[in-house]
């Protein structure tokens, strides 16, 4: 009789979905208040002028303007939203 021994089950086959972290608005892009600029774990980027930080370290715009990344001497990178000239009036 043709028999086949039962195959064992694989121990692989599971993976978690990515967390979609990273920079969402790059330098030079226009943002409006509430736009998410960076999603991160911990403080890889720090909030600068016109940028707020959520409890999960997400950086978001608090004013309309242009995004820029500033590198400080102590090695920290700050995300800044520079207001547009016409928006400052």
UniProtKB/Swiss-Prot annotation:
NCBIfam families, A to Z: L27
One GO CC term on file: cytosolic large ribosomal subunit
InterPro entries hit by this protein: Ribosomal_bL27, Ribosomal_bL27_CS
Disordered: annotated segments: 1-20
Family that this chain belongs to: Belongs to the bacterial ribosomal protein bL27 family.
Tree of life domain: Bacteria
Protein name in the entry: Large ribosomal subunit protein bL27
PANTHER family: LARGE RIBOSOMAL SUBUNIT PROTEIN BL27M (PTHR15893:SF0), RIBOSOMAL PROTEIN L27 (PTHR15893)
GO molecular function, one term: structural constituent of ribosome
Keyword Ribonucleoprotein: yes
Bridged cysteine pairs (disulfide): none
GO biological process terms on file: translation
Keywords attached to this entry: Ribonucleoprotein, Ribosomal protein
